[in-house]
């Protein structure tokens, strides 16, 4: 019978002073993670219990009288493995597996030890998409400088960062004014000597990264083929989204302002107007 030792372990945690340690563990969707049950030197475990504390409190695994058990009804059923060192392995991980976990252990002398861990599960970063926008005058010569905007975008991913790298130079550094929209857009000026220079957009989060590389000089043709992006298209990239939000806010304020009563009055007047005009129309010969 396993219920009695489980209740005794929970009573240990509730009634006795215990040592609590914390750590953060990072992993990605589709992978696995090992939650290590760390304990002091010489701590010989007699009983142990792994639980999920947040977003829901669930029993995940237990160790009692030398027996390991993980067949508990939880969101990790079939995805949890308790190792002989009492570390808990979870996988394959899903996007909703982030949360707080705890392991409560009691040694052979009856002394408890609790460890809490925070698991954060991230989506793997996909390969980004880089678009090239050119800003050149139509009468410019092919040998002249070409102003280029590089736009980088990774779909359906949160908590990511963007960075750029010039592939032909190890110590390439971007000036602050050449980056826009949190690093997603890079403005560069190219000359004839930059024909073979490639730029890479690197997208990363705490557990993964990917990149896409382009050679922007290939787009610096002053007789652009149909479908090529011009400098006007850059506005679609660099204009802040806050402008749209501002318009929505102004529209909402106008829609709910007190002047709506005046509109109702005007509508009522419009309805009455034709009725007062009808008798005049009927008196005409």
UniProtKB/Swiss-Prot annotation:
Name the segments for region: Disordered.
262-285
Q: Which GO terms describe its biological process?
A: B-1 B cell lineage commitment; defense response to bacterium; immune response; leukocyte chemotaxis involved in inflammatory response; negative regulation of dendritic cell chemotaxis; negative regulation of macrophage chemotaxis; negative regulation of monocyte chemotaxis; negative regulation of neutrophil migration
Q: Indicate yes or no for the key word Cell membrane.
A: no
Which controlled-vocabulary keywords does the entry list?
A: Disulfide bond, Glycoprotein, Immunoglobulin domain, Membrane, Signal, Transmembrane, Transmembrane helix
The signal peptide annotation in the UniProt record is: 1-22
User: Where is the chain membrane-spanning?
Assistant: 234-254
- Coiled coil ranges (UniProt) are none
**What pairs make up the disulfide bonds?**
152-201
Its name, as the record gives it, is SLAM family member 8
Q: Which organism is it from?
A: Homo sapiens
């Amino acid at each position: 019978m396993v219920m009695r030792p489980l209740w005794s372990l929970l009573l240990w945690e509730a009634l006795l002073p215990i040592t609590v340690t914390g750590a953060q563990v990072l992993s990605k969707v589709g992978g696995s993670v090992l939650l290590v049950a760390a304990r002091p030197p010489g701590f010989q475990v007699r009983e142990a219990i792994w639980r999920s504390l947040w977003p829901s409190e669930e029993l995940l695994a237990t160790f009692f009288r030398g027996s390991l058990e993980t067949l508990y009804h939880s969101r990790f059923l079939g995805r949890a493995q308790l190792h002989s060192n009492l570390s808990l392995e979870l996988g394959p991980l899903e996007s909703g597996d982030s949360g707080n976990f705890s392991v409560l252990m009691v040694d052979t002398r009856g002394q408890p030890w609790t460890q809490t861990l925070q698991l954060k599960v991230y989506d793997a970063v996909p390969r980004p998409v880089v678009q090239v926008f050119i800003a050149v005058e139509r009468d410019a010569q092919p040998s002249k400088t070409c102003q280029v905007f590089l736009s980088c975008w990774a779909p359906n991913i949160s908590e990511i960062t963007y960075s750029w790298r010039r592939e032909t130079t190890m110590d390439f550094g971007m000036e602050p004014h050449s980056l826009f929209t949190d690093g997603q857009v890079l403005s560069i000026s190219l000359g004839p000597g930059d024909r073979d220079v490639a730029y890479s957009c690197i997208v990363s989060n705490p557990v993964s990264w990917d990149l896409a590389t382009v050679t922007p000089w290939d787009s610096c043709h002053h007789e652009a083929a149909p479908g090529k992006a011009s400098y006007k298209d850059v506005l679609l990239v660099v204009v802040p989204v806050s402008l749209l939000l501002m318009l929505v806010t102004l529209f909402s304020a106008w829609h709910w302002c007190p002047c709506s009563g005046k509109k109702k009055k005007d509508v009522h007047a419009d309805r009455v107007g034709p009725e007062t005009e009808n008798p005049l129309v009927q008196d005409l010969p």
